[in-house]
Each structure stands twice: as structure tokens, then as C-alpha cells.
């Protein structure tokens, strides 16, 4: 189609080894916050065959049973039998956790009022929103997430009992560029790979994934005779999860955010409490971007914040409205400054971040579930 372009995003399921690690890290964070909302948590996880290792720095009053937290998380994901390549009952759980460095503590939060706590580190964070879907997310990443969600649901309800937790999806959308606004035209390509039980044939698997997952998730009017399907392109995928690949927390930051439609600051989200602006300020940036689009100030926008360790106020604000705005970028920055207090100690209150809410964010993107406070646009005064 003339005047159009292709854009692609990928997603991974709960049983992908990197996503296992994200979920374990956030399960530990939630366990800390459930007992001590002031916990300082920086928890990383690594996974390989028969082994989970959690390591990092945690200062908390919570009494944690790391073995139980890790095993319960893996059980919930669905790795409950060695035949699936991983078993929560028999895997080794290694723990190497120390307390937060006192050098960081004195520079960031000790002897400071909540509103004045500094950023936990330097860094840059991006937020993005678009009017192409009700969720304010690119259609590419939204559909990729929904395909993985549908496979998890079909695995759990038994309708596709041969499915295993490690799944991957990728969706290519053909867009029209309407003066900077992205307007979806059709689905160009769908890629689905799924770990499976040994007994199902590749032919049956492909047919069932197409009819029971793809055609039920993707709007029928977006599919046409030219849509390309790559379902289980490798053929066999019995060995998956940590047995197939090593996993690490924080290796799926594009999946977690905007599917490549926006710049990424580089800091991962999972396993970090609100004092880490990698997470809290990225959530705030999403909140700001979504609020700007909801207010009709633009059709698509990316915002950037930067922080320095120990300093509460952001060092810089930048916006890119891609030519879709009703006001200048300078005016929009002024609107942001007058409507949002972006200090971490204020964000924790406005977005209610000192709660055990993080484990669900570690699957299917941090900006997909519309019930989170950062997904609810703020009414702007301008």
C-alpha cells in the first residue's frame, strides 16, 4: 500500500527464562513491601537448568522466606514437572543478598522527609503514548502481549493442554503516517512460537495456534489474504524455559515498555523499589505521556526525564510530539512542569508505589494493565 510502513514488536510469555527472573525479582520485592513499605530493594535473578539464583541488595524489616517465594512463583508460572524442563519442587534456590550500601542510603534517603528523598541513581527515563489503541500503546506490542496471554489462558484452562509456559510472539502492523500520527491499516505478519508437550505434532500445533489463539485475539478485519503467518517456524520446541536458555532479570526491557516504538533509557524495572527512578520515573513518564494524549494536546508523544543520585528534582524534561501537537513543545513542557511534581518521594504517594503491586507487571508489559495508577490519565490544567 502506497504511503505506508511496517513496524514490528515482540512479546514473551511468563515461562520465558528472562521473564521467570523478572517475576521472581518482583515477587521478592512484593514480599518486602507487604511487611515494610519502606523497604529498599534491588533484587536480581538468574536461571538455568534446575537452578534459580537471587542476588542483590535489600534493606527491609520484612522476614523473608526466599525459598518459598521463589518456588511459589515458579509454580504459578507453570513449571511443576521436570518433564516440562523445570520443577519448582526440586530446583536449587541460591540466595546472595546483602544490605543496601550505606553510602547510597546516606546520599538518597537517610534523614530526609519522604518528599525530599533523592533519586536512587542517575539515569534517563522515557515515557510514550499513542492514540492508536484505547490503552495508549502501539498496536504491535498490545497484540503481541495478548497472543501470549491467550496461550497462557489456554494452557491453564486445559483447552490447549499441550502448551508449556515458554512462548514468544511477534506482530508486524502496516501503518499509515498521518502527519506524525500512526494509523494501523492491517496486520502484515504474525509470528508465534510455543513450548509444547512431546506428543503433539507440529502440524496439529500450527493449526490449533492459528484457530484457537491468533484468529481469536487479532481483530478479523485486520487480517487479510496477504497476512503472513510464521507459526512454530523452528518446528519442534519441547525443550524450553531455563533448560533451553539461561535467564536474567532485566533483559526484556523493550517487551516491558513500548515494543520499540519509543526510546528506552536502559534501566530495567523488575526487582526495584520506588526509590529507583529507573522504575518509578519511567512509570511517571508513561503517566505524563498518557495524560498529554488524553488531554488532546497531541496524538503521539515521547517524554524524557533525567535524574542524578541524591537529587530529588529531575535535571531535564524533553518532549517529542512528532508533529501531532496542538501546542509547541515548549508550551507542553511548561504544562508538564505545572501539573506534575516529579520528585520520587512525591511520585510514590501520587502513584501509590509503596505497595506489593509489582509481580503482575513482570508479565505482558508494565503499561498493559489499565488498573494501575500510572495508566489513569491526570486531568491537566492549562
From Swiss-Prot:
Its EC number is 2.5.1.6. Mg(2+) binds at residue 10. Binds 2 magnesium ions per subunit. The magnesium ions interact primarily with the substrate. Binds 1 potassium ion per subunit. The potassium ion interacts primarily with the substrate. ATP binds at residues 16, 166-168, 234-237, 245, 251-252, 268, 272, 276. The keyword Transferase applies. L-methionine binds at residues 57, 100, 245, 276. Pfam families: S-AdoMet_synt_C (PF02773), S-AdoMet_synt_M (PF02772), S-AdoMet_synt_N (PF00438). InterPro entries: ADOMET_SYNTHASE_CS, S-AdoMet_synt_C, S-AdoMet_synt_central, S-AdoMet_synt_N, S-AdoMet_synthetase, S-AdoMet_synthetase_sfam. Its cofactor is Mg(2+); K(+). It catalyses: L-methionine + ATP + H2O = S-adenosyl-L-methionine + phosphate + diphosphate. PROSITE patterns: ADOMET_SYNTHASE_1, ADOMET_SYNTHASE_2. In yeast, there are two genes coding for AdoMet synthase. Catalyzes the formation of S-adenosylmethionine from methionine and ATP. The reaction comprises two steps that are both catalyzed by the same enzyme: formation of S-adenosylmethionine (AdoMet) and triphosphate, and subsequent hydrolysis of the triphosphate. Belongs to the AdoMet synthase family. This is S-adenosylmethionine synthase 1.
Amino acid at each position: 500500500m502506497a504511503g505506508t510502513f511496517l513496524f514490528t514488536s515482540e512479546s514473551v510469555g511468563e515461562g520465558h527464562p528472562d521473564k521467570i527472573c523478572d517475576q521472581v525479582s518482583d515477587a521478592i520485592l512484593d514480599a518486602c513491601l507487604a511487611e515494610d513499605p519502606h523497604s529498599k530493594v534491588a533484587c536480581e535473578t538468574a536461571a538455568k537448568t534446575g537452578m534459580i539464583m537471587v542476588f542483590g541488595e535489600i534493606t527491609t524489616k520484612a522476614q523473608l522466606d526466599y525459598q518459598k517465594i521463589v518456588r511459589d512463583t515458579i509454580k504459578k508460572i507453570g513449571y511443576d514437572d521436570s518433564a516440562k524442563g523445570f520443577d519448582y519442587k526440586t530446583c536449587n534456590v541460591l540466595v546472595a543478598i546483602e544490605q543496601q550500601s550505606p553510602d547510597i542510603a546516606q546520599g538518597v534517603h537517610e534523614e530526609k522527609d519522604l518528599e525530599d528523598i533523592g533519586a536512587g541513581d542517575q539515569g534517563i527515563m522515557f515515557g510514550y503514548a499513542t492514540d492508536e489503541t484505547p490503552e495508549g500503546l502501539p498496536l504491535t506490542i498490545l497484540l503481541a502481549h495478548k497472543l501470549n496471554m491467550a496461550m497462557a489462558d489456554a494452557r491453564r484452562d486445559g483447552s490447549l493442554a499441550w502448551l508449556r509456559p515458554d512462548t514468544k510472539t511477534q506482530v508486524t502492523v502496516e501503518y499509515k503516517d498521518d502527519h506524525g500520527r500512526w494509523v494501523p491499516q492491517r496486520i502484515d505478519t504474525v509470528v508465534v512460537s510455543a513450548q509444547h508437550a512431546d506428543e503433539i505434532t507440529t502440524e496439529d500445533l500450527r493449526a490449533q495456534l492459528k484457530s484457537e489463539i491468533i484468529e481469536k485475539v487479532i481483530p478479523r478485519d485486520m487480517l487479510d489474504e496477504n497476512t503472513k503467518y510464521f507459526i512454530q517456524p523452528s518446528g519442534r520446541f519441547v525443550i524450553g524455559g531455563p533448560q533451553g536458555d539461561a535467564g536474567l532479570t532485566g533483559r526484556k526491557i523493550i517487551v516491558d515498555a513500548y515494543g520499540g516504538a519509543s526510546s528506552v533509557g536502559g534501566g530495567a524495572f523488575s526487582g526495584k523499589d520506588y526509590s529507583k527512578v529507573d522504575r518509578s520515573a519511567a512509570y511517571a513518564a508513561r503517566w505524563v505521556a498518557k495524560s498529554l494524549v488524553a488531554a488532546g494536546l497531541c496524538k503521539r508523544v515521547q517524554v524524557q526525564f533525567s535524574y542524578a543520585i541524591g537529587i530529588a528534582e529531575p535535571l531535564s524534561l524533553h518532549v517529542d510530539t512528532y508533529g501531532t501537537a496542538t501546542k509547541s513543545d515548549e508550551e507542553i513542557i511548561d504544562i508538564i512542569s505545572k501539573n506534575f511534581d516529579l520528585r520520587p518521594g512525591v511520585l510514590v504517594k501520587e502513584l501509590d508505589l509503596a505497595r506489593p503491586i509489582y509481580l503482575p507487571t513482570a508479565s505482558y508489559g508494565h503499561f498493559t494493565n489499565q488498573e494501575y495508577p500510572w495508566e489513569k490519565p491526570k486531568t491537566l490544567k492549562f
